[in-house]
Amino acid sequence: MPGVKVKEAEPFELALKKFKKQCEKAGILSEVRKREHYEKPSIKKKKKAIAARKRALKKQRKMVD
């Protein structure tokens, strides 16, 4: 879990900015969004397959150009 030690003369806004950056690096917000609603394993598989297909098409287009 991210944590920020605040120095005496350090403003709150700066500490908050550091904390948000640490949370972003740790991937906490994306994990929360992902777990917000339950997703059936079959739906997860479908989404994963669609994403793989998109990546493959993008890679092909890049090679053609």
UniProtKB/Swiss-Prot annotation:
One term under GO cellular component: ribonucleoprotein complex
Species per Swiss-Prot/TrEMBL record: Geotalea uraniireducens (strain Rf4) (Geobacter uraniireducens)
InterPro entries reported for this sequence: Ribosomal_bS21, Ribosomal_bS21_sf
GO BP terms, alphabetized: translation
NCBIfam families: S21p
UniProt xrefs under Gene3D superfamilies: Ribosomal protein S8
Family of the protein in this entry: Belongs to the bacterial ribosomal protein bS21 family.
Gene name tied to this protein: rpsU
Keywords, alphabetical: Ribonucleoprotein, Ribosomal protein
UniProt key word Cytoplasm: no
Superkingdom of the source species: Bacteria
PANTHER family from the UniProt entry: MITOCHONDRIAL 28S RIBOSOMAL PROTEIN S21 (PTHR21109), SMALL RIBOSOMAL SUBUNIT PROTEIN BS21 (PTHR21109:SF22)
Name of the protein in question: Small ribosomal subunit protein bS21
GO MF, one annotated term: structural constituent of ribosome
